[in-house]
From Swiss-Prot:
Gene that this sequence comes from: carRA
Designated name of the protein: Bifunctional lycopene cyclase/phytoene synthase
GO BP annotations, alphabetical order: carotene biosynthetic process; carotenoid biosynthetic process
Annotated EC: 5.5.1.19, 2.5.1.32
A cellular component term, taken from the record's GO annotations: membrane
Species this protein is from: Blakeslea trispora
Length: 608
């Protein structure tokens, strides 16, 4: 094999992988990820530089003098690059593997202190003992030198990280192991290539000479495995600390969620959260969040799955918002209770909303929960308590508007004309679109741009129109409701739908009515979807995917020629395809040439 320069090694084996990971994670990248990358790169570069100069000085490994661009101290410039590239690769891969589940759910305040002390102290004691023995075995020109240097470099850091996040790490075994093993195996393979090509060489005088596989010294395998373990553990520790900070925002942050804080202040807060044991956290808060997500998981598996493409902060708060909307909707739809009882519960919900939003965001929220606990289900109370965390983000008007939509249904108020259709859809859908958008904008410290809010409300109309077009028969048979404007129908058609006999209108008539509504949705969609491009970049993919998948139901209806389906839907594979392409903004609309669209996206990626 010809000699491979160190720079060529990066160009062929590390930078392409890093670039692929960056592209893969681009739709999900958040400010919290920025902090993680910056902090860990700083730690890796500062500590590894000293350590590596020490071992190169003692000839634990050396490099081909003609294979490097420059040398700083005793170490090639490309080696300093390796510190940064390896850190970014492993942390980025860990982010991708771990992002699909909320970090909050791996924090357990009800864990016993005895278990915590056992889980923390035993591994920490073992790691410190290894560090002590490795330090005393670090003798230059001895076979134990290189391996011992690796152990005393990595083990103390592992001990500190385990002390703060050990239990969290144990609760994520599969994700943690994948994040360690896959980058380690790849880097070991790349190391074999470099050693075989003569880019660098491991000294037999300061190593055991044992090989894991040909051209892979056991010390090199140990190095990549331990350093990647440090990076993954550090990622877990930061994820846990950030989850705690998000749950326990100070009143000052709640008063002004867009107020930026310095990197030093953020690191200081993370250190505080890192040191907090789970038992010192409010268990009720975690229970409420868990119950809220159970409501979401049971009520809408598709939304629960789709929410995974949002950043964890946004995903968590959107889940809380959805749980509140679903819990209140269930109160009004509970057929086991009389209409009057449901009206009373709706009035109580409205009182809760007014109590919540009448309070200043700068002061702790005080709610008389006993008043509600005696009259509402326990799961609903948990959703309400979790919802109070969004007080500083939301406005009262869209929440009240949503409750007006429930009242509309409880009173079985008819949709007389297109103005009623728009008003009802605004209550039950535009209001939710506005609230979701406010949550999204708040997490990225952006102003609540009125134009973006207006587009979100329009998108709510689009999705509700498609929903009504899809469910003409379902709403008729299950609810005895007609959400089509009665001005579109003859009197006898309205009566047939309200009596649960929508099918008697015939397939062609049902198709015509549904496509008329889909046409109105398509017309609004042209303007509404422009608002997505103004959202924070890490949320655009999730919003675009959710909207495109749902709006695509209209396309399914358009494809029907003779039969109106009882409940039109996309095939699972088609839904996944649209969602995936939408996340990366590669979904092809029918009115744009494919090549032009792809060229624009490729240009956007490199420019951005």
């Amino acid at each position: 094999m010809s000699i491979l320069t160190y720079l060529e090694f990066h160009l062929y084996y590390t930078l392409p992988v890093l670039a692929a990971l960056c592209w893969l994670l681009k739709p999900f990248h958040s400010q919290q990820d920025n902090l993680k990358y910056k902090f860990l790169m700083l730690m890796a570069a500062s500590t590894a530089s000293i350590w590596d100069n020490y071992i190169v000085y003692h000839r634990a490994w050396w490099y081909c003098p003609t294979c490097v661009v420059a040398v700083i101290g005793y170490v090639p410039l490309e080696e300093y690059m390796f510190f940064i590239i390896m850190t970014l690769m492993t942390v980025a891969f860990s982010n991708f593997v771990m992002r699909w589940h909320l970090h909050t759910f791996f924090i357990r305040p009800n864990t016993s202190w005895k278990q915590t002390l056992l889980v923390r102290l035993v591994p920490v004691s073992a790691l410190l003992a290894i560090t002590y023995h490795a330090w005393h075995l670090t003798l230059p020109n001895k076979p134990s030198f290189y391996g011992s240097c690796i152990l005393w470099y990595a083990c103390p850091v592992l001990a500190i990280l385990w002390l703060g996040a050990g239990e969290y790490i144990l609760r994520r075994p599969v994700a943690v192991l994948l994040s360690i093993v896959i980058p380690s195996v790849y880097l070991c393979w790349a190391d074999i290539v470099a050693i075989s090509a003569g880019t660098w060489h491991i000294s037999l005088r300061t190593s055991t000479g044992k090989m894991v596989v040909p051209d892979l010294p056991v010390e090199e395998c140990l190095f990549f495995t331990l350093i990647n373990t440090v990076l993954v553990f550090a990622t877990c520790a930061i994820d846990r600390a950030q989850a705690i900070l998000h749950l326990y925002k100070s009143s000052v942050q709640n008063q002004n969620p867009k107020q930026a804080i310095s990197l030093f202040q953020h690191v200081k807060e993370l250190a505080w959260a890192f040191c907090l044991p789970d038992q010192m956290l409010n268990n009720e808060l975690f229970d409420d969040l868990t119950i809220s997500w159970d409501i979401l998981r049971k009520a809408s598996k598709s939304f629960y799955t789709a929410s995974a493409v949002f950043p964890s902060y946004v995903r968590q708060d959107l889940g809380v918002l959805y749980a509140f909307c679903r819990a209140t909707d269930d109160l009004c739809d509970d057929e086991s209770k009389s209409v009057q009882e449901r009206r009373d519960q709706l009035d109580l919900t409205r009182q809760f909303v007014r109590d919540l939003f009448s309070q200043k965001t700068s002061a702790p929220i005080v709610i008389d929960w006993e008043l509600y606990q005696n009259q509402l289900p326990a799961s609903c109370i948990s959703a309400f308590r979790a919802f109070t965390r969004l007080r500083h983000v939301l406005e009262v008007d869209p929440v009240e508007e949503l409750l007006d939509g429930y009242k509309w249904d409880l009173e079985r108020r008819p949709i007389l004309d297109e103005q009623d259709l728009e008003a009802y859809s605004a209550c039950v859908a535009s209001s939710v679109g506005e609230m979701c958008t406010r949550v999204i904008l708040a997490q990225d410290q952006k102003e609540n741009d009125a134009w973006i809010i207006d587009r979100a409300r329009e998108m709510g109309l689009v999705l509700q129109y498609v929903n009504i077009a899809r469910d003409i028969v379902t709403d008729s048979e299950t609810l005895g409701r007609c959400y089509l404007p009665q001005q579109w129908l003859r009197k006898e058609e309205t009566e047939q739908i309200q009596q649960g006999n929508a099918r008697s209108l015939g397939d062609q008539r049902l198709l015509g009515l549904s496509l008329k509504l889909v046409g109105k949705a398509d017309a609004i969609m042209v303007r509404a979807k422009k608002g997505i491009d103004k959202l924070p970049a890490n949320c655009q993919g999730g919003v675009r995917a959710a909207c495109q998948v749902y709006a695509a139901i209209g396309s399914v209806l358009k494809q029907q020629k003779t039969t109106y389906p009882t409940r039109a839907h996309l095939k699972g594979s088609e839904r996944a395809k649209i969602a995936l392409l939408s996340v990366y903004n590669l979904y092809q609309s029918e009115d744009k040439p494919v090549a032009l669209r792809q060229a624009r996206k490729i240009k956007s990626f490199f420019v951005d």
